[in-house]
Amino acid sequence: MGEHGFDLPPKATREVMDWREELADRTCEALAQAGLPAHRVDLQGRPGANVQVDPLADGGVLVEWGTQEELATAAVDLLESGVDPSNLPHAIRHYETVQTCMRDAILQILASAGFHVARADAHTYGSAVHVKGRTL
């Protein structure tokens, strides 16, 4: 049990983390070959595919699309100001469309390149793609 009275999720072993780091590098390479800007998480915030390694035992390699700051900021600002969920402003709908289209494109591109991919758990990882391994 952790110091605050609850169990922390188990971390992946060093061997698993090394494998995930290699998988993340191959993921970036495959996306770059397809013409998409791809970056490891240490450069997150840049537009393009942000690839990160989740250190939890049940984690993995995740890819999430990052838009230009102006698009994301416009959507966040509107959400923070309070909006009617039944009538979302155009900026929010556009941001959501971009995220969905790019997630689906990344899924298809990586699958075509020989990766085993799936939509990540939306509750935990939002619109990310979970890269589970390579099939080739």
Per-range role (PLM):
Residues G5-L8, A12, V83-N87, A91, ...:
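Generic alpha-helix detector with strongest preference for long hydrophobic helices that associate
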Residues H90, Y95-L136:
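Short, compact, well-ordered microdomains
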